C-alpha cells in the first residue's frame, strides 16, 4: 500500500467525520454516502472505513483524551478541527503501526487543507500535548 492511499483515506475520513458530526446521521448511512458519492481513486477504502467507524464509535473515549489539553470547551472547537483531532487521536491511540510523527503531520496537512488560517497551529499544539502525555 502506498502512503498516498492512506493520505487519501484520511482526507475522506475527515470529511465523513465532519459530515457525521454536523448531521447526526447514522454512521452506516454517512459511510454509504461517502463510498457511493465520492471518488475513491487511490483511496485505501478499508483504512477509510476503519478511521471513520473508529472515530464515530470511540468518540467519547477520544474526547476524554483531547479535552484536558483544550484551552476552551470542546463545543467551541470548530467542527473541522474537532474532526481532525479526533481522527489523529484515534490513530495515535489505536493504530500503533502509524508513527506518531506521521499521524501529527497528516493532521497538520488536513488542517491546512480544510481548516481556518491558524487551524494547523492549534492542531499541532494539541496533538503535541496529547503525545507528551502518553
From Swiss-Prot:
Gene Ontology biological process terms from the UniProt entry: DNA-templated transcription termination; transcription antitermination
Keyword Flavoprotein: no
Claim: Transcription is one of the keywords in the record: yes
MF terms (GO), sorted A to Z: RNA binding
Any single Gene Ontology cellular-component annotation: cytosol
Gene3D superfamilies: NusB-like
Record keywords: RNA-binding, Transcription, Transcription antitermination, Transcription regulation
Chain's role: Involved in transcription antitermination. Required for transcription of ribosomal RNA (rRNA) genes. Binds specifically to the boxA antiterminator sequence of the ribosomal RNA (rrn) operons.
Record family assignment: Belongs to the NusB family.
Protein name, UniProt field: Transcription antitermination protein NusB
Native source species: Shewanella oneidensis (strain ATCC 700550 / JCM 31522 / CIP 106686 / LMG 19005 / NCIMB 14063 / MR-1)
Lineage: Bacteria, Pseudomonadati, Pseudomonadota, Gammaproteobacteria, Alteromonadales
Name of the gene encoding the protein in the UniProt record: nusB
